[in-house]
């Protein structure tokens, strides 16, 4: 497990193949609880290529010096991401 927020990743390798490729990450909050958003792609074994961009928001809690994942929310498409952006922009817009 990761000891720092910077070490947290969604990248995953299985059998020498990177099945989850992390493209970017942003740290939203740091501390005993950390929130990060990741942009990533899954490996499509059938096609032999990476699929479309996906996004995930993950919450980690630091326990005994290591961050442990406590929750996640997966955003499976650009369309869903844009819908979330639209709603949050409307809710958090200027007063």
Question: Where do the model's predicted regions map?
Answer:
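Positively charged, low-complexity terminal tracts
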Residues: 1-78, 82, 86-95
């Amino acid at each position: 497990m990761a000891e720092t927020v910077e070490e947290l990743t969604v990248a995953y390798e299985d059998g020498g193949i990177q099945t989850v490729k992390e493209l970017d990450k942003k740290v939203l909050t740091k501390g005993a609880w950390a929130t990060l958003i990741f942009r990533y792609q899954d490996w499509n074994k059938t096609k032999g290529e990476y699929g479309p961009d996906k996004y995930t928001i993950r919450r980690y809690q630091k326990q005994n010096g290591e961050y442990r994942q406590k929750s996640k929310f997966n955003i499976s498409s650009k369309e869903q991401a844009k819908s979330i952006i639209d709603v949050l922009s409307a809710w958090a817009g200027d007063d």
